[in-house]
Amino acid sequence: NSSLASKNYDYDYDSIQPYFYVDNEDEDFYHQQPGQLQPPAPSEDIWKKFELLPTPPLSPSRPSLSSIFPSTADQLEMVTEFLGDDVVNQSFICDADYSQTFLKSIIIQDCMWSGFSATAKLEKVVSERLASLQTARKDSAVGDNAECPTRLNANYLQDPNTSASECIGPNTSASECIGPSVVFPYPITETPKPSKVAPPTDLALDTPPNSGSSSSSGSDSEDDDEEEDDEDEEEIDVVTVEKRQAVKRCDPSTSETRHHSPLVLKRCHVSTHQHNYAAHPSTRHEQPAVKRLRLENSSSRVLKQISSNRKCSSPRTSDTEDYDKRRTHNVLERQRRNELKLSFFALRDEIPDVANNEKAAKVVILKKATECIYSMQTDEQRLVNLKEQLRRKSEHLKQKLAQLQNSCLSSKRH
């Protein structure tokens, strides 16, 4: 048991760290313990005690089909070792002595290090144990002897997040166990509650959470989460909240699992024409009649499209219909305001007094336009009168010219 405990204690990172206190408080802290490294001296920097370990490597991926279904020679060899040697059985079974040693270890009592580096290491060990246990169970099914599988501990096959119940042997009482809430008060990742334990034939298909590969039942939800993360980086025009229906998936076994996804943000785009009223107008000429007809046609198309969508789609609630009406009204109102603004700009450019004043108010533009119209009408009347006077003068001169020509001809005859 001591050799087994020392061998399995390798994944406890505290055994190789010189920055932790010794379990026995009566011993001298600065006294070098046998089998441990030299603790830091008082002159060293105190902050070195709180340095975090580098990021641990990722957990191994799911075992391949070759490891799940070994060859016939490998099956016979593993069956003989599994049935003949008791030491091999102890690699799959955690007895009471080792469980007590594991519960007394610093990695369980220290919540900080249990939440960081040791979790990935424990998950790696659990995934390896699951793969080896699956192979051993299939090999034991080949031989008709069912004596040793009765000692297998089913508690070890549960979720690795239930830290204390991973390696509790069948002889360990419930009072010696440590609750997950005591060891890990703050969970690292939010994982769904584990369902009932599946039959032993399906154990190799499930991998521990936070591992490098995902199970087949949760692949769709993880892909959806990745797509949502990509969409969050883009600009969302309108966000609506929808609740997904429960998706039913049938596993290769007879068990059926139902997955409920939380509220999901769905992206919707509203085709509205936005205009920056503070920007400088690009053109100062009034729009021709052709462009106005195009705008009217586009607005009528919007109305027809919305009405056709209402007819084709399923019956909506009154709130959705009101929202469509408001959206259509806003689009048409925005177009009307744009046309009115362009008309004021064109009128301002025709008035000499405010032609160069880009910040002229609409009231000033209208007043100056009225004054300009009155002055233009006065000038027009004056010019009309002048034209009439000039016409009369030209007729009088023509008559005088005709009289002079007649007098000249009469003088030549005499």
Swiss-Prot record:
Localization per record: Nucleus
Keyword Nucleus on entry: yes
Chief location: nucleus
Composition-biased stretches (Polar residues): 296-317
A cellular component term, taken from the record's GO annotations: nucleus
CDD domains, per the entry: bHLHzip_c-Myc (cd11458)
Stretches assigned to the bHLH domain: 324-376
Region Disordered, residue ranges: 192-263, 296-330
PROSITE patterns the record matches: BHLH (PS50888)
Keywords of this entry: Activator, DNA-binding, Nucleus, Transcription, Transcription regulation
Biased composition (Basic and acidic residues): 240-259
Region (Leucine-zipper): 383-404
Keyword Transcription regulation assigned: yes
GO molecular function: DNA binding; DNA-binding transcription factor activity, RNA polymerase II-specific; protein dimerization activity
Bias (Acidic residues): 220-237
Domain notes: The 9aaTAD motif is a transactivation domain present in a large number of yeast and animal transcription factors.
The protein's assembly and partners: Efficient DNA binding requires dimerization with another bHLH protein. Binds DNA as a heterodimer with MAX.
Protein's UniProt name: Transcriptional regulator Myc
